[in-house]
Design a protein with these regions (language model features):
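Extreme N-terminal starter segment of soluble prokaryotic enzymes
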Residues: 2-5
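Acetyl-CoA-dependent GNAT
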Residues: 8-12, 19-98, 106-111, 115, ...
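Alpha-helix N-cap/helix-start and coil->helix boundary motif
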Residues: 11-14, 132-133
């Protein structure tokens, strides 16, 4: 059943957003990112980070089903130094595992793309773990293409590669 409503997040959503982030990371990245890193993720610590981020220049939207936050997307200006000011960035998009393939991810993605375009961005980027074929397939199905840029990222002492994706808005 699809019951997804997408709305701009509020400060009071920080706990729910953090819960989504931790649960999704543990489900999506188990076997990819070191277990120690995933097991050490703390919802209350993440919630405090989300409360602090509410003052940053980026937007966060949530997907709800039956008044429960089941996913979120965060986006804003691109943080990469090698792109123009006309490029936005999808910073994060996560949906609770029991809501995967039910439309919440696509609804959040589509809101992100519409909002970035409405802010005057011509293109957008995002970074995905190279070792995460599920995420890469999701993005590619929505029109994103790897642009050749990669960066290493350390997860609890394990170096992983992030791949940059790009799409026109």
């Amino acid at each position: 059943m699809r019951c997804v409503q997408v709305r701009e997040s509020e400060l009071g959503d920080a706990d729910a957003i953090a819960h989504v982030q931790v649960e999704t990371w543990r489900a999506a990245y188990r076997g990819i990112v070191p277990d120690m890193y995933l097991d050490d993720m703390d919802v209350s610590e993440r919630a405090e980070r989300w409360r602090q981020r509410s003052t940053e220049h980026r937007s966060t939207w949530v997907a709800e089903c039956d008044s429960k936050v089941v996913g979120f997307v965060a986006f804003g200006a691109c943080r990469d130094g090698d792109v123009s000011a006309a490029v936005g960035e999808l910073h994060a998009i996560y949906v609770l595992p029991d809501r995967w393939r039910r439309g919440a991810g696509r609804a959040l993605h589509d809101r992100c793309v519409a909002e970035l375009g409405g802010c005057g961005f011509d293109e957008a980027t995002l970074w995905a773990l190279d070792a995460n074929p599920g995420a890469k397939a999701f993005y590619e199905a929505l029109g994103w293409e790897a642009d050749g840029a990669t960066v290493p990222h350390d997860f609890a002492g394990t170096e992983m590669i992030l791949v940059r994706y790009r799409r026109s808005l």
